[in-house]
Amino acid sequence: MAKHRYLPMTEQDEKEMLDVIGVKSIDDLFQDIPEKIRFKRDYDLKPAKSEPALLRELSKLASKNANTAEYASFLGAGVYSHYIPTVVDHVISRSEFYTAYTPYQPEISQGELQAIFEFQTMIAELTGMDLANSSMYDGGTALAEAAMLASGHTKRKKILISGAVHPESSNVLKTYATGQHIEVEVIPEIDGKTDMDALKKALSEDIAGFVVQYPNFYGQVEPLAELEKLIHENNSLLLVSSNPLSLGLLTPPGEFGADIVVGDSQVFGIPESFGGPHCGFFAVTNKLMRKVPGRLVGETVDENGKRGYVLTLQAREQHIRRDKATSNICSNQALNALASSVAMATLGKTGLIEMAKQNLDKSHYAKQKFRENGFEVLFSDGFFNEFVVKLSKPIKEVNESLLDEGIIGGYDLGFYDTKYEKHMLVAVTEMRTKEEIDAFVASLEGVK
């Protein structure tokens, strides 16, 4: 009979397994752990609860969280509060789709493969690039993989990255680069954008590529046309990290001549979820097609002439040639990519443009409201849905007081750069109403 309620193994099973591996007891398996640090007391667990009692307790705990269903959120910095069409959860909950894994058997996975193909197609169209892959883990790892591709393609070992790129993405790149012995140099930002003079001085024949964010971490729209000319004159690659929603209004990076465009599709159908899991995307020009990391789904025809979808160019991947793979990305974000596909398809081209326009209009209204009320708003150039406001108190204190008023405040820029202490990065999406924006500005009146 089994010793444990939830483990079907009997004492005889246990004895036979221990005999096979040559140990006498379960304790022998942990002999490498010093005796003095082993946990030997009984677990101080509370008595078991019934399911309804447990649900009540967990609901009570969950209610302590500040959530965007009950609070007006002005927090962005890479993760945003956007409307998720109700059909998204319905579709991704279907058993045929409910997996984060890539389908290796096309004969029984046509639905999922087509959904991934649609994701690739929509991302390629939004970014203005020739093709996109099936997804990456998130925007930060997509950016790092783009830099690795640039280094491998150009056979150069140095990457330049704008200081106006999200600092967390920049840190992910530095982590990747360490293992590959690639040097990363940060080009400072000035007035919320890349310092062009510093970039010109840093360019040399050992530069594989330059990474820029569009719109950038401070919400500003970088001059991609000018950057493209500079970078390509140096025979380096232009790598652009972009918010895909902004591309409903902004000129796509591909039209400026970007070589690689990456980002995170969290803005389409994926909840904030305390920072993840989300869904990175990776789009390139045709010349880089065979060096793309991750899965690629292609359209073909079977022996009867019927349309079909398959994983293509698989020789690039680690499950085929691990030591020579373009990347070691494995199980990807297929389920979240599906969520983004459903959200984009539901919005359609007109709806996506309208959603982007609402972000633009509402954020510009908020910025104007701050200025009218005497706040110092940094940077005067164009932006999409984020801007920077200077306050008189530490942002952490301000945000704690805002929670009492049902408001989730903006991002504390001083967290990564002391130059921006007491500066708040404010994000305004289509979810915010005029009344909420007005209340937010009024709540900050005492700290301007």
From Swiss-Prot:
One of its GO terms (biological process) is nucleoside metabolic process. One of its GO terms (molecular function) is glycine dehydrogenase (decarboxylating) activity. It comes from the Bacteria. Its EC number is 1.4.4.2. It catalyses: N(6)-[(R)-lipoyl]-L-lysyl-[glycine-cleavage complex H protein] + glycine + H(+) = N(6)-[(R)-S(8)-aminomethyldihydrolipoyl]-L-lysyl-[glycine-cleavage complex H protein] + CO2. Pfam families: GDC-P. HAMAP family: GcvPA (MF_00712). This is Probable glycine dehydrogenase (decarboxylating) subunit 1. The lineage of its organism: Bacteria, Bacillati, Bacillota, Bacilli, Bacillales.
